[in-house]
Swiss-Prot record:
Residues 35-204 form the NAC domain. This is NAC transcription factor NAM-B1. It holds the Pfam family NAM. It is found in: Nucleus. One of its GO terms (cellular component) is nucleus. Residues 1-11 have a biased composition (Polar residues). PROSITE patterns: NAC. Residues 1-40 are annotated as: Disordered. One of its GO terms (molecular function) is DNA binding. High grain protein content (GPC) is a desirable trait in breadmaking and pasta wheat varieties because of its positive effects on quality and nutritional value while Low GPC is a desirable trait for barley malt and beer production.
């Protein structure tokens, strides 16, 4: 019973030679070649003419079946990528060329919905030097596709590079003359001009123009930012830099209340230029000059208290006084009894010899209602002192014990 089973089993097994040496399935005509990842088909002009077009015209085997055979002038350029064998951004084709007129040599450039127009001059294709000189083997022509009918077509971004053979190599593919007349009658003229030309098709993108536009807009934004920065006066940052570099108590006194709602700034006495103070010998010199000008201005009334309101020509009323931390406000502001002598004014500030810091000390007030006013800022012209005397102070503090004499 075992013999029939064994015989039947052996009969069902195929011969061993049927499993070996099976040929691979034939590749479909026009299918893309199997290239390793990273490889691109991007030959030079010489390689296209010598290794592909010349062999195609001579009916010799090509290195690889990668260029499709398509009559380009029967399609629009945006239909060609689907008919290409290989390519991502540029596509290669073998295409015939026909005559525009039966008795002429001009090629027909008309397509389905437009036409190809030549641009520039023909570029000769030279083979590599094998002996003396280089041999001209082909010509390259650039064309642009236009929608519509000539000469008022709409230019597109589709570009064609057409390669054709020249010289002896073009004898088998080009028919430059019309067919001869035989038997007293003209035979039907053939419109075929070239059996094969090699064409490269690609679409020109506007990435370069977009990159230039983005760069220009970026530069315009940078210029706008620079203009906005330069619009601010440089003395604002100079004053802050001077305060950090020298550690001057005089500058710290100005910036002590920057975070508060009411900044310590005397309206009418301090200008924007005076806020940006720079510590150093130059600032001390301006402060000494301001002290001398103040003393000379108050010299006629040095023996008697000087009334700021009587010197005012406009009779302006002092604005409402505001409280600041660290400063004492007089109780007699409501009655407008601001008075001080020149000697008291001269003893309000002490400038250190050879130093770069101005120390303002808060000391007890002398003699009742006399108030010492420290004029902050550098430099202060005599006109600014006179304007301050006639317009009044918005903030007044009691500071004494500082020598105004240079």
């Amino acid at each position: 019973m075992g013999s029939p089973d064994s015989s039947s089993g052996s009969a069902q097994k195929p011969p061993r030679h049927q499993h070996q040496h099976q040929p691979p399935p034939p590749r479909r005509q026009g299918s893309a070649p199997e290239l390793p990842p990273g490889f691109r088909f991007h030959p030079t002009d010489e390689e296209l003419v010598v290794h592909y077009l010349k062999k195609k015209a001579a009916k010799a085997p090509l290195p690889v079946t990668i260029i499709a055979e398509v009559d380009l002038y029967k399609f629009d350029p945006w239909e060609l990528p689907e008919k290409a064998t290989f390519g991502e951004h540029e596509w290669y084709f073998f295409s015939p060329r026909d005559r525009k007129y039966p008795n002429g040599a001009r090629p027909n450039r008309a397509a389905t919905s437009g036409y190809w127009k030549a641009t520039g001059t023909d570029k000769p294709i030279l083979a590599s030097a094998t002996g003396c000189g280089r041999e001209k083997v082909g010509v390259k022509k650039a064309l642009v596709f236009y929608r519509g009918k000539p000469p008022r077509g709409l230019k597109t971004n589709w570009i064609m590079h057409e390669y054709r053979l020249t010289g002896a190599s073009a004898g088998s593919t080009t028919t430059s003359r019309p067919p001869p007349v035989t038997g007293g009658s003209r035979a039907p003229a053939s419109l075929r001009l070239d059996d094969w030309v090699l064409c490269r098709i690609y679409k020109k993108t506007s990435k370069a123009a977009a990159a230039v536009g983005d760069e220009q807009r970026s530069m315009e934004c940078e210029d706008s930012v620079e203009d906005a920065v330069t619009a601010y006066p440089p003395y604002a940052t100079a004053g802050m830099a001077g305060a950090g570099a020298h550690g001057s108590n005089y500058v710290q006194l100005l910036h002590h209340h920057d975070s508060h709602e009411d900044n310590f700034q005397l309206d009418g006495l301090l200008t924007e230029h005076d806020v940006g103070l720079s510590a150093g010998a130059a600032s001390l010199g301006h402060l000494a000059a301001a002290a001398r000008a103040t003393k000379q201005f108050l010299a006629p009334s040095s023996s008697t208290p000087f009334n700021w309101l009587e010197a005012s020509t406009g009779g302006s009323i002092l604005p409402q006084a505001r409280n600041f931390p660290g400063f004492n406000r007089s109780r007699n502001v409501g009655s407008m009894s601001l008075s001080s002598t020149a000697d008291d004014m001269a003893g309000a500030v002490d400038v250190s010899d050879g130093g770069n810091a101005v120390n303002a000390m808060y000391l007890p007030v002398q003699d009742g209602t006399y108030h010492q006013h420290v004029i902050l800022g550098a430099p202060l012209a005599p006109e600014a002192i006179a304007g301050a005397a006639t317009s009044g102070f918005q903030h007044h503090v009691q500071i004494s014990g500082v020598n105004w004499n240079p």
